[in-house]
Amino acid sequence: AFLPCPESAADDAYRAALLGDAARTTTLTKVISGRPARGMVNEFITLGESPDAPPVPDFPIAYDAERALNRAAKASGDAGYAAQWAGQGAPLSRAMPAANLVATLRAELAGAAARLAAIV
């Protein structure tokens, strides 16, 4: 929820992915880190999960390799090799300052609790 907030350390490409169509396509993969985790499907995941891809090394070898590859790709302007972790709720992300997001979530929770109380 907080990654798109300006206070987060997420880079612009990660924020854009979370707020765009990429957030609608997540997958559980070992490709990025060597451990199962859910991320937005990008070039790295697509290549790593292709049928002819080599086996993924265990953590931390896979994660260290991904980080090095991502640094090199970013240096050439390619954001498709980043670990862009995201859960199934990623499409619900909203870009706003963290304080505003907390206030919005608090108000939404209060509204949902009131609606629930009205039907129970």
Language model features with spans:
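Conserved active-site-proximal phosphate/metal-binding subdomains
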Residues: F2-V120
